[in-house]
Amino acid sequence: MSRWLLDFAVADGFAGFVRLELRETERIAWFWTYLVGVPDIEGVIVVRDHEVLLPRQALEIRAEGLWAELWCEAKREHWTIGLEAFGVRLDAPEDALRAGGEIGERIAVGLDIEWEVGDDGPPAGVVHGDVLVGRARHAIDGRGWFYDDATPDPGPVEGEVISTVYIPVGDGCVERRLVRAGGALLWSLDRREILGGRGDDRR
């Protein structure tokens, strides 16, 4: 399995992450984009697909209602992320765990953003570009962390929890929290839970 992860956060609480996993043995790819704190929009914006065909070239994926590409401009220094998709807006993070998958308001989501390494070296850097949600375009310029296949996932972070998201995975979920720690906003990658009493397939 190979994976790439971009976390980003702006000081006002607008934040998100993008993850692409190539699961070669299963011949599928997993793709996630989650956004929180979007100006003038309540709740969590979700684009999640666990049944994407493996890319035919580079890191470009296509599925129904989804196109995304992660492009390496310079290894461990500069990446570009593009997305055109339809996602859903959830009123509450827990709505992601309902039987049958995420159910919410259908909404257009787009990304045209870049990550560039910072003075401290990877994975830390800066993210800038445009995030599109519905008919609105939001320019972002903030901190970002890019984890390529050679960089371990981020771990738990302690601090004031600003937002939480849940990502259904198999019979459980991954919990990610946006945390204010040491004056900065950071994404924490927390535990994977097994959700009891659920017989449906959350893939």
What are these regions (language model features)?
Residues M1-R203:
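Structured soluble/peripheral alpha/beta segments that form catalytic or ligand/cofactor-binding pockets
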